């Protein structure tokens, strides 16, 4: 090799090492595997199963350790004690949102999911209060979910017991509920705009669940120069936002400040009252991104969980039989399920909790960030450091759930068959960044599943032992495999 080339390469390598060396400002971060210049620990992580990689690292470095995704350090919390201590005991310090450049580019730092600082605090405060005003957790929203459950039954009956992929039909129900909250109306399941919205949400979730997507978040410099699914992600997000912008403009033209109809109206009224509020930023763009966040979150969480539930209920028909027996005893065949029934249905309630625990829908949640220099255990974590919370390690903790890799509603039942709560149940994360839609999702899962099982027998196309229940895993979500079943009216 040419000596000059060798010299240039050597100097380049030394420069990288110089740039990479830990600086005094990084504090005493937890231990972790040695990172490589530029790549960090990226090459040591299985991007197709980040959960397992994190579990393996925890066996060597303990419940608190550091990984480098590219050049940026990320403190990883593994196990209930570490996650609970950070998100609840040190809730304010760990309430920041970690940098995720692909999402930030799409949301422009607005909305509720990926905003930070005062913008996030004001947006969350407004969102929680508005959802409460619209009846979240009350009979008002319950009626909407019950009505949609009846529409869902009607749509499922149209399959006439023939094999079908439930992905689309099941996704329509929670999507319509969130539509009724955001802009007051539901859609027919054949509506063209509705079909487009559902398709964009499905494609959006599929893209963010790919290993390639994680690469662009770790190496944001690639965003503007390399082709990839990050551009398709932006396209689907923009398509959803564009439709919701149209709805916002319709609301602006018909707004009655004395009679708010839905979430959009509440925002527009608040904009009139607090014009100039720099923390909330009451702009049309902020509203569009906020309702897009709510729309995607309100659709995908329940939709994916419902599909997983159907798959697991086919895999374990003896569990389905027990649930349907309880439905028959408590509700019967001639009235709609309601939330008051849940307290009298411990096995059904336990089954739904076990679905959420077992599928581990958001393995690591979304990245957190410490909002100030933080002393945590024996470590000093500088302000702005990203924090990854392994929700998998909590939901699959053997200490709390004796057979964590088995689907067993008994994990949430005591020795007398009564429903048993667990502090380890964190499918929606915990603390100040906990999902604002947890109550709605829980209501939808109970009412949709009990209504389906009240009206149909689930028939698999194969022997239960041959049903594949392995999810497609990524850092952000778990997606059920494609499957078909028959809804047989009873």
UniProtKB/Swiss-Prot annotation:
Keywords: Endoplasmic reticulum, Heme, Iron, Membrane, Metal-binding, Microsome, Monooxygenase, Oxidoreductase. GO terms for cellular component: cytoplasm; endoplasmic reticulum membrane; intracellular membrane-bounded organelle. It is a peripheral membrane protein. It catalyses: an organic molecule + reduced [NADPH--hemoprotein reductase] + O2 = an alcohol + oxidized [NADPH--hemoprotein reductase] + H2O + H(+). It holds the Pfam family p450. Its main location: endoplasmic reticulum. It is found in: Endoplasmic reticulum membrane; Microsome membrane. Its EC number is 1.14.14.1. Coiled coil: none annotated. Heme binds at residue 435. The keyword Endoplasmic reticulum applies. This P450 is active in 15-beta-hydroxylation of steroid sulfates. Belongs to the cytochrome P450 family. This is Cytochrome P450 2C12, female-specific.
